[in-house]
A protein has these predicted regions:
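Terminal targeting signals and extreme-terminal segments of soluble enzymes
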Residues: 1-103, 107-158
Length: 158
């Protein structure tokens, strides 16, 4: 897939997700229509009995990035609602406690007004590919506030 960060992706101020995503602890780093970049520092409580990042956490990161990539709102205070219809994941390399993961999500063109597709990739701090995902999603009516999500001034982010 090799998703690239677009030059116009806007930096996002640190904030806390609500619900399950808040428990996982990933953050939005940059966002624009059709693209999101997230990050996660792997913690012991996210690892399985083998000391590796649990596959369910990887799937959550892939799913979350897919949804964000396709539900952009330029105010950053609310985004469209969506649900996952189908998702395929490929685990490529293990991640461990202390690893810092970069998660990239990208929207893929669709002929439908109610559904969309997205692809996602997770990389470790060395730039090695950890996992990939591809899914189909359905837009719901309305928007939801993500609380304090806000864009940073580009100069402040540099």
């Amino acid at each position: 897939m090799a998703i690239q960060r677009p030059a116009d992706a806007r930096p996002v101020a640190a904030h806390a997700f609500r619900g399950f995503n808040g428990l996982v602890g990933h953050e939005v780093v940059a966002w624009r229509p059709g693209f999101v970049e997230m990050s996660l520092k792997v913690r012991p409580e996210l690892c399985n009995a083998n000391g590796l990042l649990h596959g369910g956490v990887l799937m959550t990161l892939l799913d979350s990035a897919s949804g964000f990539a396709c539900t952009f709102n330029d105010t950053a205070t609310a985004r469209r609602l969506s649900v996952t219809l189908a998702f395929t994941t490929q685990f490529i390399k293990a991640a461990r406690d202390g690893d810092v993961l970069g998660i990239l999500g990208a929207w893929r063109p669709s002929t439908s007004q109610s559904t969309f597709a997205a692809e996602t990739e997770i990389y470790d701090q060395k730039g090695d590919l950890v996992a990939t995902g591809a899914g189909t999603f359905r837009y719901l009516k309305g928007e939801r506030s993500d609380g304090m999500l806000s864009f940073l001034d580009q100069k402040a982010a540099d």
